[in-house]
From Swiss-Prot:
GO terms for molecular function: 4 iron, 4 sulfur cluster binding; 4-hydroxy-3-methylbut-2-enyl diphosphate reductase activity; metal ion binding. This is 4-hydroxy-3-methylbut-2-enyl diphosphate reductase. It comes from Desulfotalea psychrophila (strain LSv54 / DSM 12343). InterPro entries: LytB/IspH. (2E)-4-hydroxy-3-methylbut-2-enyl diphosphate binds at residues 49, 82, 132, 172, 229-231, 273.
């Protein structure tokens, strides 16, 4: 790719992209806790799945831990945006921790749905990724029959005690197509299956739709986001499903010159936990290597804002 090329080179920026309302709330919650209570503030697991965000908050005085026992009694403990199980909540209280729940409100709504189905005597199926913190937190909201199914193949093998009372929910950051493949099997095997129209959060759906639009008018898609970010991985998959090459990158340092040979139109998006500064870094990298025109795509406007969480009494 040469800056002397006469080809018309374009950068097209997906809209919406980057931070969603739930991520913004979680980050604001940590910053507010630091401001109101001082350092250190402890966070159970990564508040969101992006190392740049984590590093920034760590520099501000946040301490990230994997076990509640790592937190001193009486200290502030923030639960991540992905949510936690009832057992974690009870354990934190038993350890004398002061807790703040930064669970995304949309994830909390799935928790309430699971609790409702469980109270009605249903076996609950969670369509989602095994060992993902959101799925583990959702599964842990109740005791009893809860099953996690990640694929259509797993759905074919699922065995439940009562097929006449069965309901499903989904991880909020999945791709719609992945969920539908599993549901086709579940509905065939369990005709009385209950469930919502969709648990995919609006931000996840909006960003996936934006990538589909981007894929139709670009030669290559760059998805800015961490490798452990579920929604970022889904964005890359949505791009490749259209036949457009798509790469998941942590930041501009992951870019390779070879990707852009013969490429005139580059699409850029970012996962829901990736800050806009990382997108800007990618754009700067490209501008140093070609005479690009930058176009901001039009897409679904998001005006939702969630208030930061405070101490649980």
């Amino acid at each position: 790719m040469s800056s002397e090329s006469d080809k018309k080179l374009e950068i097209r920026l997906a809209s919406p992209r980057g931070f969603c309302a739930g991520v913004e709330r979680a980050i604001e919650t940590v910053k507010l806790a630091l401001k109101e209570h001082g350092e250190p503030v402890y966070v159970l697991h990564e508040i969101v799945h992006n190392r740049h965000v984590i590093d920034n908050l760590r520099q501000g005085g946040a301490v990230f831990v994997e076990e509640l026992e790592q937190i001193p009694a009486g200290a502030i403990c923030i639960f991540s945006a992905h949510g936690v199980s009832l057992q974690i909540e009870k354990r934190a209280k038993a350890l004398g921790l002061k807790t703040i729940d930064a669970t995304c409100p949309l994830v909390s709504s799935v928790h309430r749905m699971v609790e409702k189905y469980h109270a009605e005597g249903c076996s609950v199926v969670i369509i989602g990724h095994h060992r993902h913190p959101e799925v583990e937190g959702t599964a842990g909201r109740v005791t009893g029959e809860v099953y996690v199914v990640a694929t259509a193949a797993e759905a074919e093998k699922l065995q439940v005690n009562n097929s006449e009372k069965i309901a499903f929910v989904t991880q909020t950051t999945l791709a719609e197509n992945d969920i539908e493949q599993v549901l086709v099997v579940l509905r065939r095997r369990f005709p009385l299956l209950q469930g919502p129209k969709s648990n995919i959060c609006f931000a996840t759906q909006n960003r996936q739709n934006a990538v589909r639009t981007l894929a139709r008018c670009t030669d290559l898609i760059l998805v800015v986001g961490s490798k452990n970010s579920s929604n970022s991985n889904r964005l890359r998959e949505v791009g490749t499903e259209t036949g457009t090459p798509a790469y998941l990158i942590d930041d501009f340092k992951d870019l390779k010159e070879s990707w852009f040979r013969g490429c005139e139109r580059v699409g850029i998006t970012a996962g829901a936990s990736a800050p806009e500064s990382l997108v800007e870094g990618v754009v700067v990298w490209l501008l140093k290597r070609g005479r690009y025109e930058i176009t901001e795509m039009t897409g679904q406007q998001e005006k939702v804002h969630f208030k930061a969480a405070s101490l649980i009494d």
